[in-house]
Each structure stands twice: as structure tokens, then as C-alpha cells.
């Protein structure tokens, strides 16, 4: 449907997506699946899950691409797809990094004090 409405995004290097609803649904679902592996208390899981669910609900509720772009407030729908891809990539990295675990060693006493 997006291909019928516009021929270009107007952004260099960013091609028009013919199936933005399908693409966003897949990306948001994959992100939510990865977040299920995080502990429930992890801040990244809590807030990313909330935002991703809100965006997924918008994608499911609004069939018109232009209205969806306005709802998501992320620019062109292709830019939103790019953001969703980056969030999925970050979620995978965060799962590997495990930032919710305690530090391996204690930080120096005045690490965050400035000026020293």
C-alpha cells in the first residue's frame, strides 16, 4: 500500500517499504520475544516492553500509513522501521551484556566525583 502512495521517502539511501505494517509487526514481535529473556525487574525490559507494546498496538490499529506515521511520531514509516531494527539489535546486545547483574568488582570510591 505504501508503494502506491509514494515513490520515494525523500531521504537519501532510504528506500520505500512496500509492507510497513508487516515489517514493523515482525520487528516489534521479535523485540518483545527477546525481552522475555530479561529479568522482570530489569529497567531496560520494563520500559522497552512498554514502548514497544504501545507502538505495536498502533501498527495493528491504524491501517493508513500516513496516519500511522503521525501516531508513531518517528518521521517516515521507513525511519520508524530503521529505529525498530536498531532497537532489536540493541536488545540482543543487552541480553548478551546482562547489565542487570552486579559489577564484577567494586568501582573506585571517587569514580564519579568531579573535580577531584
Swiss-Prot record:
Modified residue annotations for Phosphoserine: 89
Gene (name only): Ndufa5
Bilayer topology term: Peripheral membrane protein
Keyword Zinc: no
Organism from which the protein derives: Mus musculus (Mouse)
Subcellular location: Mitochondrion inner membrane
GO cellular component, one term: mitochondrion
Positions of modified residues (N6-succinyllysine): 98
Post-translational modification comment from the UniProt entry: Acetylation of Lys-98 is observed in liver mitochondria from fasted mice but not from fed mice.
Protein name as catalogued: NADH dehydrogenase [ubiquinone] 1 alpha subcomplex subunit 5
Annotated InterPro entries: NDUFA5
Keyword Oxidoreductase included in the entry's annotation: no
UniProt cross-references to Pfam families, sorted A to Z: ETC_C1_NDUFA5 (PF04716)
Major subcellular location class: mitochondrion
Description of how the protein assembles with itself and partners: Complex I is composed of 45 different subunits.
Keywords annotated in UniProt: Acetylation, Electron transport, Membrane, Mitochondrion, Mitochondrion inner membrane, Phosphoprotein, Respiratory chain, Transport
Gene Ontology biological process terms, A to Z: aerobic respiration; proton motive force-driven mitochondrial ATP synthesis; respiratory electron transport chain
Purpose: Accessory subunit of the mitochondrial membrane respiratory chain NADH dehydrogenase (Complex I), that is believed not to be involved in catalysis. Complex I functions in the transfer of electrons from NADH to the respiratory chain. The immediate electron acceptor for the enzyme is believed to be ubiquinone.
Loss of function: phenotype: Lethality around embryonic day 9 (E9). Conditional knockout in the central nervous system does not lead to any visible phenotype until mice reach 10-11 months of age: then mice become lethargic, lose motor control and have difficulty maintaining balance. Defects cause loss of other complex I subunits and reduced NADH dehydrogenase activity.
Amino acid at each position: 500500500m505504501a508503494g502506491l502512495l509514494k515513490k520515494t521517502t525523500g531521504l537519501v539511501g532510504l528506500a520505500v517499504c512496500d509492507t510497513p505494517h508487516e515489517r514493523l509487526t515482525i520487528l516489534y514481535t521479535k523485540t518483545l520475544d527477546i525481552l522475555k529473556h530479561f529479568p522482570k525487574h530489569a529497567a531496560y525490559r520494563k520500559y522497552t516492553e512498554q514502548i514497544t507494546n504501545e507502538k505495536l498496538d498502533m501498527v495493528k490499529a491504524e491501517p493508513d500509513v500516513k496516519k500511522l506515521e503521525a501516531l508513531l511520531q518517528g518521521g517516515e514509516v521507513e525511519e520508524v522501521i530503521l529505529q525498530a531494527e536498531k532497537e532489536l539489535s540493541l536488545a540482543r546486545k543487552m541480553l548478551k551484556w546482562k547489565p542487570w547483574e552486579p559489577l564484577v568488582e567494586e568501582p573506585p570510591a571517587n569514580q564519579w566525583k568531579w573535580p577531584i
